[in-house]
């Protein structure tokens, strides 16, 4: 594979994470406007976004096998057609059924693209470089989280229709589509297999279970927190939509900076120990945010939370890939799927909590989930295999 083609595939991976990040993160910003558009309470409206998360989950789960049947290039080109149809449906459709269908399609496209992006990084890069590349790729999720809430706030403040926010997100897929046209993709399945090398199956071990639970709790906690921050800030502290949007943007800006910093720092530390410390710090920072009565402190606490939690998810995935001597794409995909289940459950879990106890109750629940991540990381220390495989500094 030549360097220019590798660079194009790497940028496809970057954009794939940005696309998923944008779709998932702007939900909290546009939810109120969409609820008003369909004359529904916000807590009821949040349930329809489960279609987006379900689409992401189903496509990531199925694509572990579909990638070996349908060429990656064809999947991405077909995804572009689906993306155009879904955004057109959001703009032209007036029913809740059409909205839910379009959200599901956007989820499917996003999940397929992100699973391909993750595969490309794990396929093209190995060892220490894989971990840092995955972390940098994941930073584009955060970058989208920094940019698109600002874009959404600008559009909504000017009374521009909420569906234009999704049209702006669609521009990311235009970039993916153009790069795809000029790229050569690795071949999977029997055509790409080396017939001369037997496949050796390794047992995953109980450490993978702890990592999977941690991944699920982390994503559910993170999204359950960040999706309800705008609602919490406006209702509890009387902020306007721009101020609430800035809080979300502050979180993802700090998160992105943290990813860049930790991509250099992590190689000097044992991954299990550092992720345990980061989970403890993140739990503490979220507790400070949830418990403070001073609106001026919210920005400081949410930036601290973003920074210390930035490396947790990617480190969990990297630790998962190091639980076997030879990295297993299916193992990585399994942990990624568990994280995506957390995404899908976001509004299923937090919707009823908000309906009964308000946004503050959802944030407190998210804090409890972060505590569960810390416990899982602590337990992992007793069973992890990454040290015995000589992967301590990866």
From Swiss-Prot:
Pfam family, one: MFS_1
Keyword Cytoplasm tagged: no
Organism of this sequence: Serratia proteamaculans (strain 568)
Protein's UniProt name: Protein TsgA homolog
Similarity field: Belongs to the major facilitator superfamily. TsgA family.
Lipid metabolism keyword on record: no
Membrane topology qualifier: Multi-pass membrane protein
Alphabetized GO MF terms: transmembrane transporter activity
Chief site of localization: membrane
Residue intervals passing through the bilayer: 11-31, 51-71, 76-96, 101-121, 134-154, 162-182, 206-226, 251-271, 274-294, 302-322, 334-354, 363-383
Cell location: Cell inner membrane
Keyword annotations of the record: Cell inner membrane, Cell membrane, Membrane, Transmembrane, Transmembrane helix
Gene label: tsgA
GO cellular component terms listed in the entry, alphabetical order: plasma membrane
């Amino acid at each position: 594979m030549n360097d220019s083609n590798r660079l194009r595939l790497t940028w496809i991976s970057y954009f794939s994470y940005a696309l998923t990040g944008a779709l998932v993160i702007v939900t909290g910003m546009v939810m109120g406007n969409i609820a008003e558009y369909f004359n529904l309470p916000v807590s009821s409206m949040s349930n329809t976004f489960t279609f987006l998360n379900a689409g992401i989950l189903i496509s990531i789960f199925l694509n572990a096998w579909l990638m070996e049947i349908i060429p990656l290039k064809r999947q991405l080109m077909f995804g572009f057609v689906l993306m155009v149809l879904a955004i057109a449906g959001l703009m032209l459709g007036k029913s809740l059924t059409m909205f839910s269908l379009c959200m599901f399609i956007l989820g499917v496209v996003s999940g397929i693209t992100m699973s391909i992006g993750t595969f490309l990084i794990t396929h093209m890069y190995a060892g220490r470089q894989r971990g840092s590349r995955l972390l940098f790729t994941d930073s584009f999720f955060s970058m989208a989280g920094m940019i698109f809430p600002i874009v959404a706030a600008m559009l909504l403040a000017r009374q521009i229709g909420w569906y234009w926010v999704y049209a702006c997100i669609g521009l990311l897929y235009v970039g993916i589509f153009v790069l795809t046209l000029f790229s050569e993709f690795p071949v999977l399945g029997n055509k790409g297999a080396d017939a001369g090398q037997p496949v050796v199956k390794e047992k995953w071990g109980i450490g993978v279970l702890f990592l999977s639970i941690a991944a699920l709790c982390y994503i559910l906690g993170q999204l359950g927190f960040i999706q309800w921050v705008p609602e919490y800030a406006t209702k509890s502290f009387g902020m306007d939509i721009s101020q609430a949007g800035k809080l979300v943007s502050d979180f993802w800006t700090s998160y992105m900076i943290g990813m860049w910093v930790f991509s250099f720092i992590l190689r000097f530390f044992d991954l299990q120990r550092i992720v345990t410390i980061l989970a403890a710090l993140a739990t503490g920072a979220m507790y400070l945010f949830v418990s403070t009565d001073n609106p001026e402190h919210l920005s400081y606490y949410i930036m601290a939370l973003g920074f210390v939690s930035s490396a947790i998810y990617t480190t969990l995935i990297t630790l998962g890939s190091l639980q076997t001597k030879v990295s297993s794409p299916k193992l990585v995909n399994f942990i990624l799927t568990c994280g995506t289940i957390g995404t899908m459950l976001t509004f299923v879990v937090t919707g009823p909590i908000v309906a009964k106890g308000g946004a503050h109750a959802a944030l407190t629940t998210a804090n409890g989930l972060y505590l569960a991540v810390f416990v899982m990381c602590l337990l992992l220390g007793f069973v992890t295999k990454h040290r015995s495989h000589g992967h301590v500094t990866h």
